């Protein structure tokens, strides 16, 4: 990951830059999702290494803060991670697409806690099916683009199941449906 200052003719490597691999100073694939907190720490979703890494500002290598134990369904593993969110306490939320769940990793934790889904793939309100993206609001409600079910789900903090807030009536163009391929979500200030 490169940082480019305005007007600069070249950038500075701030994370990675040591070839492809699984060492703590490498990434296993092209990086598509990362997050920078107010302390300038960089959280990187390393999809092919099934991990989220934190690179402290100015560090030469990262630390694994979620996953990193190969692909799988145990609470210390991820399977096709597809999104990250870092809250104000630096807890890491991972959209674990292959396990049809969202997992929260507390700072310093070695395992995550399922906060949405995690009951196999399906269409019940306690399940997700190929979730594609998510958004977490200031009250820690989780909104999930549940693309396999053509719906958007809202999971309140501590809830064992979500509620459908959009779609959920199959693929299509009717006012109560979501089209296939609707895989991004954004919530405005009105919720």
Give the predicted meaning of each segment:
Residues 1-2, 50-54, 100-104, 150-154:
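A short loop-to-beta-strand structural motif that recurs across blades of beta-propeller domains
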Residues 5, 46, 56, 96, ...:
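Structural recognition of the beta-propeller blade-terminating site
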Residues 25-28, 74, 79, 87, ...:
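Intrinsically disordered, low-complexity repeat regions of secreted/extracellular protein precursors
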Residues 36-39, 86-89, 136-139, 187-190:
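Residue-level detector of Asp-centered blade-edge/turn motifs that repeat once per structural unit
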Residues 41-43, 92-93, 142-143:
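Conserved beta-propeller blade signature
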Residues 91, 123, 135-141, 147:
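Surface-exposed interaction/gating patches
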């Amino acid at each position: 990951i490169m940082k480019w200052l305005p007007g600069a003719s070249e950038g500075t490597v701030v994370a990675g830059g040591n070839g492809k691999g699984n060492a703590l100073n490498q990434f296993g694939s092209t990086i598509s999702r990362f997050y920078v907190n107010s302390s300038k720490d960089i959280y990187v979703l390393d999809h092919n290494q099934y991990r989220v890494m934190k690179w402290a500002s100015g560090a030469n290598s990262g630390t694994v803060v979620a996953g990193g134990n190969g692909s799988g369904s145990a609470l210390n593993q991820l399977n096709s991670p597809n999104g990250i969110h870092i809250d104000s306490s630096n807890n890491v939320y991972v959209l674990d697409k292959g396990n049809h769940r969202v997992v929260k990793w507390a700072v310093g934790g070695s395992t995550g806690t399922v906060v949405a889904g995690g009951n196999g793939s399906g269409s019940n309100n306690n399940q997700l099916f190929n979730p594609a993206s998510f958004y977490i609001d200031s009250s820690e409600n989780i909104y999930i683009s549940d693309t396999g079910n053509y719906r958007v789900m809202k999971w309140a903090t501590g809830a064992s199941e979500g509620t459908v807030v959009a779609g959920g009536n199959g693929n299509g163009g009717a006012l109560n449906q979501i089209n296939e391929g609707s895989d991004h979500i954004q919530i405005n200030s009105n919720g």
